[in-house]
């Protein structure tokens, strides 16, 4: 969620020097190593997890009751000769699909066609996918050979940020890079291909992955499959929505502060943030903060993906004795409010674990979250100069306000005044907190918390107060101390929803989000298991314990009506709405603690600065939504959108409380993203134009790490940024 890093620990830019390196050869060498990557299954650690995937492989039906759209842009149905239905596909895990392909009961090409058809039909509502590569994916599926790949022929969606695939869009969320494509394929992506996945497209994310929601100005808002009135999370929001909606069984993501686990919690999917340095192709972010991995619908698939991408051969098998106490807390590490629903989710998990014979001990949260996050934001702001670097390379001039969203601009201006000494001090303090956490794990091997403090917030809530947006527009007029305080203050509203995820990244520890809870409004909520470095398998065993005992609780998404043309709105018929009043559940105990610390947050008037450009919330102008196709959900009044259960939801009490102070006046007109949802899917000529480097041209390259992951602009000359003295 909220931080960007560079390959250097300090990244305030004053000048550059170019260092020529054989980048392409290095990447090639790394990629060649992935071909020998095999699935490592430790017997002791995998027995419980294997049990969760031991059910019979989905039976191949001879019925074709689900009409599958052709992958071609004409939208015709797949031939009736196909015996594998869309329903079969949506119910199957990635491992089951690979087994079917291996046993020749279905072809990878058929699976890809189904995945493309679902995506093109349902994406106009969710805006989870930003590009499709139909022709390439079908060609790769047809040519696929079985060499023992664990995910043979399984369709996969790739996160659009930080995971380069040669020839595909590589914008980092910047409008001025809308035509840029990757000049090479990253090691992580190559490893996914070597594992047998067929990449069918790329998923939505916020600009540079800064946020815990995906509300990109360029691509629009990625919304939640369980209720499109709510966010899908960030920064891997498109990935979470794609998996929850069964576009694909697994989508790749990246996590530098919760960017896998936050969407997992809010979309009812499984999200693992692996330990520092154990996954192939991990970024070179400072202290290994960013990791690349994926989201899935089952712990079994997550475990198989982990073992496939694992590079550390001596990782412990993982074992949690019932004699070892498990710690739990529902306290926010920063003292911010936590919803009653999140507390209930943890309480249910505690009761289940006690029934299984484990000892549970309630503790105070061992981390000083306010102190940790101030260090976190120092590191983030110190690396925002990457936006200026890219603007200079592409536009041949310094970065200007209109080039980027408001948050990127504010971080860039703040970063100019952050010295290398400040960044070093921040990391030193983080290391001290990590040491204290390591000592905690000596007594309690597991810490159980909510993954997020509440269910997904409403898309009417930009998670930015209007007075903060106004101050950010003039941030260059503030002192360095005032700038840093503003960065902390403006992020506090968003951080209040997700205070539990950042420590795992900064400390290098693994963390697993498992979807065990569904609110009365039908929105998912995850619980999070945290442990010490390299104890990933222990976490996966705990997740498997919940899965094997049917404690994975995911909302049900109704199948579309096959007898009529799909409605891109995703709304049920209004006359069937049992409760369109929008009133909150009267029986639900309100949580009035959703307000941030009033001593730290200026009073939110709710009125925008009329003279200021709206913030970079990524939300479309409501007055234009029904007139254009530029909003996240076309032709829809987003204040009147019932959920899929047929009722208007009020969201969590925490959501209501924060909405009351933050959702007025900060609607952004910046969210006129470049591609309408309808034109984006199924009409390749309207996707970003692919501009490849000329043969023999030396293309500048940089390897910067953001909250959402690492991005490699292209291979060529690497520019190393000097830090301010």
UniProtKB/Swiss-Prot annotation:
Homodimer in solution. The active site is at residues 159, 235, 259. Changing residue 235 to A: Loss of activity on the lipoyl domain substrate and on lipoylated small molecules substrates. This is Lipoamidase. It is a single-pass membrane protein. It catalyses: N(6)-[(R)-lipoyl]-L-lysyl-[lipoyl-carrier protein] + H2O = L-lysyl-[lipoyl-carrier protein] + (R)-lipoate. The gene is lpa. Residues 556-637 have a biased composition (Basic and acidic residues). Optimum pH is 7.8. The keyword S-adenosyl-L-methionine does not apply. It is found in: Cell membrane. The lineage of its organism: Bacteria, Bacillati, Bacillota, Bacilli, Lactobacillales.
